[in-house]
């Protein structure tokens, strides 16, 4: 069997919603589901190994195992044909989930869990895994409906991470039997104008020329993929404005939004760009963040 879909649980309602989404993703891929709960002593944040002392029915470790068992049952109810395994892994949530993602085809987490502070829009696990995961990371947002309908929205910006995101978006759309909405937003103040092939020709400077360049960027980013995925219809949108606003707006009609972890405008050293962070906080549907192969290694 191919690499499983990974999902993290913490006993929250958001965690169980993520399990249902992850189970559907596993079923579409024809693979298994690995459900993980990271366990540590909550007062001192010290990892707690199983103890030979005390009743087997008691203690926090047993509660953690029951939590995982309930998540496995929930996965079985959501997708009866998916083989789901549960594991209580000793350690803090952030490094445990990042390490577990090495062997996963996809990692799924809720947008917030029991550890989120009141008022926060996004939990630390979702942000950390999106930035450090070794596989694509799907953060469950919106109503958390596993069967939410609509196109897969792909954010296109011409970056290496964006290219990996487009590939993932096409594969995901094919699995779901839906189409792609490829969105590229640009600003005339940030547009990159390529030099003319003819040295004697003038540089593009008018709004029409700039728009044509952005249309070309989108076409080049999609080139070849429509041939590989002939059954996936593609709708293209080139919008003048900010990518964050454009993609958040597109998320209202989407089943999933897919973006690269960092785009062309990302600062060196940043693992998660402003667009992906904005979507993780404000999108109206689940968000998949894809890092380039170079960034994952």
Where are these regions (language model features)?
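Small/aliphatic-rich secondary-structure junction motif
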Residues: 1-54, 150-204, 226-228, 233-237
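Structural beta-alpha unit
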Residues: 1-2, 14, 21-24, 55-58, ...
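Fold-core signature of tandem repeat domains
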Residues: 5, 67-68, 97, 166, ...
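Short glycine-/small-residue-rich Rossmann-like dinucleotide-binding loops
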Residues: 10, 72, 112-113, 157, ...
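Gly/Ser-rich helix-loop-strand patches that form or flank binding pockets
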Residues: 19, 24-28, 94-145, 252-297
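Short, solvent-exposed amphipathic alpha-helices that sit
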Residues: 21, 63-71, 213-221
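General small-molecule cofactor/ligand-binding pocket signal
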Residues: 34-36, 85-89, 138, 183, ...
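A short acidic, glycine-rich active-site loop
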Residues: 53-66, 202-213
């Amino acid at each position: 069997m191919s690499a499983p879909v990974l999902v993290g649980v913490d006993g929250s309602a958001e965690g169980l919603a993520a399990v249902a989404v992850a189970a559907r993703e596993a079923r579409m891929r024809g693979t298994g589901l690995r459900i993980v709960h990271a366990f540590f002593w909550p007062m001192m944040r010290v990892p707690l190994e199983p103890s030979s002392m005390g009743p087997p029915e008691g203690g926090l470790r047993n509660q953690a195992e029951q939590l995982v068992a309930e998540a496995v049952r929930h996965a079985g109810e959501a997708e009866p044909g998916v083989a789901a395994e549960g594991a209580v892994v000793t350690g803090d949530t952030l490094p445990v989930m990042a390490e577990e993602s090495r062997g996963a085809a996809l990692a799924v987490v809720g947008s917030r869990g029991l550890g989120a502070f009141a008022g926060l829009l996004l939990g630390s696990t979702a942000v950390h895994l999106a930035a450090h995961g070794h596989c694509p990371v799907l953060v469950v947002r919106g109503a958390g409906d596993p069967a939410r309908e609509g196109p897969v929205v792909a954010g296109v910006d011409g970056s290496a991470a964006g290219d990996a995101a487009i590939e993932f978006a096409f594969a995901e759309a094919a699995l779901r039997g839906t189409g792609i909405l490829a969105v590229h937003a640009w600003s005339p103040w940030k547009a990159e104008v390529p030099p003319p092939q003819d040295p004697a020709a003038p540089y593009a400077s008018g709004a029409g020329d700039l728009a044509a360049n952005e249309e070309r960027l989108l076409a080049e980013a999609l080139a070849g993929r429509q041939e590989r995925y002939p059954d996936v219809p593609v709708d293209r949108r080139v919008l003048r404005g900010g990518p964050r606003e454009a993609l958040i707006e597109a998320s209202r009609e989407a089943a999933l939004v897919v973006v690269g972890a960092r785009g062309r405008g990302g600062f060196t050293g940043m693992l998660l760009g402003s667009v992906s962070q904005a979507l993780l906080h404000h999108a109206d549907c689940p968000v998949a963040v894809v890092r380039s192969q170079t960034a994952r290694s």
